[in-house]
Structures are given as structure tokens and as C-alpha cells.
Amino acid sequence: MELRAKEIKKKASEAARNEVLHQTLSSAGDRFVGLREAGFSQLNDPDGLRIRGRQVKERSFANLPRLLRLLEKKVTDAGGVVHWAEDASEARSIILDLAGRYGVKSVVKGKSMMTEEIGLNRAFSRKGIEVWETDLGEFIVQLADEIPSHIIAPAIHKNKEEVARLFSEKLGVPYTVNPEELTMVARRTLREKFLGADMGITGGNMAVAETGTLVLFENEGNIRMATSLPRVHVALIGIEKVVESWDDFGVLLTLLSRSAAGQKMPTYLSLITGPSKPGEHDGPEAFHLVLLDNGRSRIIGDEVFRDSLFCLRCNLKQPP
């Protein structure tokens, strides 16, 4: 679904009158705040951690050209391929060209705000390529033909009754409001999509330049499936996601996990360095990393707006 500017006023008016939506968002917001406070309460110096997180990003931005060149070299050394995209159009073209080269008919995706930024799903649909969101919230939003409403909880605006009706209508399953049963419906449906997919597409929480490693955080396991079952893995990240070292990674891991969900670390932490190697029995045959600028290099040099690129996509809405 593409939300046009003229529709926003109407949508906002409808949402303002929706009491169920108000209750759903209020409950979810309280839950996020509680988890975050509990997570940071376990640290001796949470403010110091935030300062170190900002220092990591400052160093990365100050050395960005060098780090990006190093990242490209290390990814290439590991058997991967790096592509440079100046804007959204070029990123779409690169990924669609890869899909054509590998004869891709079906794609599974991990949750990625970057693919939303470039409008990738619509581009696939126009080419007749089947694409499935595999994050539970994104899957719900896709079935409803909506856009994500939250950076880490895409379907935060829907309650279990709405999801139950949606699954019954779109997937032809019996109506149930039991969360475990609804989750199993999604799991069974998506398992078939994983097994039949030719390409997996993800974003990335970080890229560690010194080893050429893509870092992915998640709590559901769908991203790991999307990166290990299809024969081709394409990762799309903004150039601001690169950090130099594993020490830098450790600082941001601690900060992001606690801020997003009050966790010491995510349930699944995937560290991907190139495609599968000879003798390995899982993982993709090919790994492609698409580095997207799309105005980021200009923003990094802007004293007013550069803070927007310090964002870790952690739900706090306040960059370190």
C-alpha cells in the first residue's frame, strides 16, 4: 500500500476517532516503556553507555569513506559481492537485476525499513515476483495491504481480534483470538514460503568493517531462515550502518537490545560473513550487500540533520 499525501488527513481523522486503536497503542506503549526501564536498570552507568554509543557513531562517520572501502574489501574477500546505490531507484534496479540473473520467482524478506524506504515490494510485484514478509508484524500488515505503523512493531495498531479476522479472511483458517494459535497459523504459512523461496532479502543492524560481517538482530527466527534457506541472500543497508570493530559492535549491541525490548541481547543474533563455504551444509550460495546512500552522505555533513543518522532503530526515538 502506498499512502499518498492527500490521504493522510483522512486517515488521521479516522484514527483519532478509533477508541480501540487508542487502547491498543496505549497498552503497547506502556509495555515498551516498562521493558526499557527494566533493561537499563540493570546497568551501572546507562548514561555512560549512551555516551559511548554516540562516540562509536561519531568515529564511524568521521572515518566513513575508509570504513566503507574496508567493508567492501572484506566482504569481497569472504566471497560476497558489494553494490553501491546512489539512490532508491538504483537500489531497486540492482536488486531486480539480481533477481533476474538468478531466475528468482519467490522472495522472502526479513523486517527491513530500508526496503520500505526504496519501495522494493511494489517493484517486485510489478515484475511478477512473489514477495513475502516473514516478520509476524510485517506479515500481518502485508495481508491487510497496509504500511508498517511502528519501527520495531509494524502491526502495533492491530489487536488480536483484528488479526483473527484478517487471518480467517485471507488465509481461510477458523477464527480464533488465541495468540498462540494465530502465531502457529502464521508459522505454518510462512514455513512453506521459506522452503520455496529463491531469494532472501534482509536489512542489517550493523556491518563490521574489520571482518566484512553483516549483523542482524531478531527475536522470531525468521531472519535466520531468510538468510540460510534461499540460495541467494541480498542485504540492503544504509551507509551509516558501518562500524569499524567488534568493540564498537559490543557497545551498540548492549544499547540497542536494552532500548528496543529490555533484553541483554536479542534472542537471535546472526553474524554473516559472505556466502556458505565449501563443506558447509546451510547458508546461501551467493551473498550480495547493497550499500545505499540516498542522501545520507549529504546529511552526515549537515550539522542540523546529521543526528537523524545516529538512530539505532531501537524504538527510543532519541538517538544516543
What are these regions (language model features)?
Residues 1-305:
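The feature marks the mature, well-folded catalytic cores of soluble enzymes
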Residues 304-320:
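Cysteine-centered iron-sulfur cluster-binding motifs in ferredoxin-type domains/subunits
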